[in-house]
Amino acid sequence: MLSRALLCLALAWAARVGADALEEEDNVLVLKKSNFEEALAAHKYLLVEFYAPWCGHCKALAPEYAKAAAKLKAEGSEIRLAKVDATEESDLAQQYGVRGYPTIKFFKNGDTASPKEYTAGREADDIVNWLKKRTGPAATTLSDTAAAESLVDSSEVTVIGFFKDVESDSAKQFLLAAEAIDDIPFGITSNSGVFSKYQLDKDGVVLFKKFDEGRNNFEGEITKEKLLDFIKHNQLPLVIEFTEQTAPKIFGGEIKTHILLFLPKSVSDYDGKLSSFKRAAEGFKGKILFIFIDSDHTDNQRILEFFGLKKEECPAVRLITLEEEMTKYKPESDELTAEKITEFCHRFLEGKIKPHLMSQEVPEDWDKQPVKVLVGANFEEVAFDEKKNVFVEFYAPWCGHCKQLAPIWDKLGETYKDHENIIIAKMDSTANEVEAVKVHSFPTLKFFPASADRTVIDYNGERTLDGFKKFLESGGQDGAGDDEDLDLEEALEPDMEEDDDQKAVKDEL
């Protein structure tokens, strides 16, 4: 009898030790294959980050992830945050389809079959708000002023619906809007004290924010669509700084026209320049997103390169559209006054500004080597020569794939250097742009056959000398296809995903 009791005690102790064996770092559970199932069983809601120790984006996320974990733990939430070193736990990474770093997945009730992909931003508030939306009601019921104050204080942006009848059609439309937005906390109230505190005497919706004017009152008929539009127009600051944390809000938002102020924080009239930019932004809410970029920051140098800017040329303003075709625009004036920036934006919206195409100077020896060097200024003349078949690599100097291709491309140039009508060429697409070709990836390989109809053929075959030769000898047929590689928007954005073959590129930046 005693031995059985001791056995039960030992098993109970072992179970307790097993649960306690879940190691924590900064309130984040450290998971391995050996304790992953145990963690899922112990926690109803579990957000898991699969990371790599060398990943720059993972390092940038770490303090915000820990802050979110601490906040939820302090609230006594059932939600816990965890992390897995995917380079050590490759079986787990493969099991959950990890192809980039960081990959973040949300597990509910231990369900391993279909965890949700995390889709919000990289700040602690974004993480907490997304998780609360996934685990609770779309809008929190605010029964008194203390609850309302707590909600407003909890996040940079909050939305509260004030409805004397929370079963009304307007209230139902409000809840539909709340369900559609993951990263902003919503509250709903019928309490007269809350109405009074926030100076409302009838039904309405208010967006509270800890920047700019502090609050925005919705006006008009309350419908889901109109509320979503109202929130889109008001949830971001008039001017948002481009950082690792704000990038998802910038690229993931619905506003696809961005004007960027490249401004070193060390410049003497920094406050004045930023103030002018902010004044200009007031007239374009919901139409153009105004973004400030610290041009002195090392992490932003690739963005300067993308716009053909050097640090010494800043402060400067550029505009870009992020629709299907990314197009850049440059102000006609270098003056950075609110009036000049406002005029530039109006002219752009009226369709009176032509795209800005970058070009380097034509090198004196551009055609002296087997691989010809093209720039914006000589591209048309060479690529669309009716008597020549021209095969062009569009590359980025920092791109790892391009560096791997370089010796093969040089050999291809040697192979055809004396050919009467085949030209092998290359163009640095970070410094040169042409209207006839939109480069979406690096490297992009395009073939311009000898003809008068300006035909362009994408190459997507093997990146080998034999593959290229077969393509050329077949007249651009063997290996033709859509181009696909490192997307330009991904190249600009500090993306949440970073796969192994991009690591070399990112480590250089």
Curated annotation (Swiss-Prot):
Catalytic activity annotation: Catalyzes the rearrangement of -S-S- bonds in proteins
Modified residue annotations for N6-succinyllysine: 224, 273
Localization per record: Endoplasmic reticulum; Endoplasmic reticulum lumen; Melanosome; Cell membrane
Predominant location: endoplasmic reticulum
Segment forming the signal sequence: 1-19
Disulfide bond positions: 55-58, 399-402
PTM comment text: Phosphorylation of Ser-359 by FAM20C is induced by endoplasmic reticulum stress and results in a functional switch from oxidoreductase to molecular chaperone. It also promotes interaction with ERN1.
UniProt-listed GO biological process terms: cellular response to hypoxia; cellular response to interleukin-7; endoplasmic reticulum to Golgi vesicle-mediated transport; insulin processing; positive regulation of substrate adhesion-dependent cell spreading; positive regulation of T cell migration; positive regulation of viral entry into host cell; protein folding in endoplasmic reticulum
Active site: 55, 58, 399, 402
InterPro entries cross-referenced by the UniProt entry: PDI_thioredoxin-like_dom, Prot_disulphide_isomerase, Thioredoxin-like_sf, Thioredoxin_CS, Thioredoxin_domain
UniProt family annotation: Belongs to the protein disulfide isomerase family.
Assembly and binders: Heterodimer; heterodimerizes with the protein microsomal triglyceride transfer MTTP. Homodimer. Monomers and homotetramers may also occur. Interacts with P4HA2, forming a heterotetramer consisting of 2 alpha subunits (P4HA2) and 2 beta (P4HB), where P4HB plays the role of a structural subunit; this tetramer catalyzes the formation of 4-hydroxyproline in collagen. Also constitutes the structural subunit of the microsomal triacylglycerol transfer protein MTTP in mammalian cells. Stabilizes both enzymes and retain them in the ER without contributing to the catalytic activity. Binds UBQLN1.
Protein name in UniProt: Protein disulfide-isomerase
